[in-house]
């Protein structure tokens, strides 16, 4: 199916955001908003979001990929994935405004873009959203961070000669020891929950 791509701009809390809308001649009733992950913009690594959008548009879906505030060509301060709900809501709005036949929107997100989509839907229960496609969502909790630090940092640190020298000479602070013990306990608690 043939489609047309066009640059679109829209306003979110006073800032102008930019995106690319790929729209087939006769779009399906459900459209897709691509939510990028990490510090990327609407093209994506190796043009992955361009290729994805074009493939979906050729299959009959209207697709909007856009830059959050502070990323790519969009204005405003840079956002983290847990602070882009307004951007996502505005993107859905412009998509439905530009393609009035669209009744529902599916959010497609990669990595922390997937987490942003999930958080958006959880926070808003937006009735316009009828689907989520979440690829590799990224979530960090205190317990998962502690487990990662114990596994990757502290294990390696115990093998370093200078650590043992600092410990033996009394240069390791009480705060560091307490932090290590707390993180080890958190990591152990998480491991017990997973088993």
Annotate each language-model stretch with its function.
Residues 1-30:
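N-terminal cap/lid segment of alpha/beta-hydrolase-fold proteins
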Residues 24-67:
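Short, surface-exposed "cap/lid" segments of acyl-processing enzymes
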Residues 39, 68-72, 139:
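Alpha/beta-hydrolase active-site loop signature
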Residues 119-123:
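Active-site signature of alpha/beta-hydrolase-fold catalytic machinery across serine-
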Residues 127-195:
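The alpha/beta-hydrolase serine catalytic core
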Residues 106-109, 135:
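Short beta-strand immediately N-terminal to the catalytic nucleophile in serine-hydrolase-like folds
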Residues 108-117:
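Gly/Ala-rich beta-loop-alpha elbow adjacent to hydrolase catalytic centers
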Residues 71-104:
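Catalytic nucleophile-loop/oxyanion-hole region of alpha/beta-hydrolase
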């Amino acid at each position: 199916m043939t489609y047309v791509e066009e640059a679109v701009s829209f306003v979110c809390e006073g800032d102008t955001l930019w995106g690319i809308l790929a729209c087939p001649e006769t779009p399906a009733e459900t459209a897709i908003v691509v939510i990028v992950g990490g510090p990327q913009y609407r093209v994506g690594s190796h043009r992955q979001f361009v290729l994805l959008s074009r493939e979906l548009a050729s299959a009959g879906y209207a697709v909007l990929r856009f830059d959050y505030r502070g990323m790519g060509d969009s204005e405003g301060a840079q956002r983290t994935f847990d602070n882009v709900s307004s951007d996502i809501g505005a993107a859905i709005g412009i998509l439905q405004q530009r393609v009035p036949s669209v009744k529902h929107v599916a959010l497609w997100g990669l990595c922390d873009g997937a987490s942003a989509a999930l958080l958006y839907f959880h926070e808003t229960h937006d009735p316009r959203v009828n689907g989520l496609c979440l690829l590799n969502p990224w979530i960090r909790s205190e317990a998962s961070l502690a487990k990662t630090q114990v596994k990757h940092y502290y294990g390696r640190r115990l093998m370093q000669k200078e650590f043992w020298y600092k410990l033996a000479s009394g240069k390791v602070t009480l705060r560091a020891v307490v932090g290590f013990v707390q993180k080890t306990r958190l990591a152990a608690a998480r491991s017990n929950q997973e088993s």
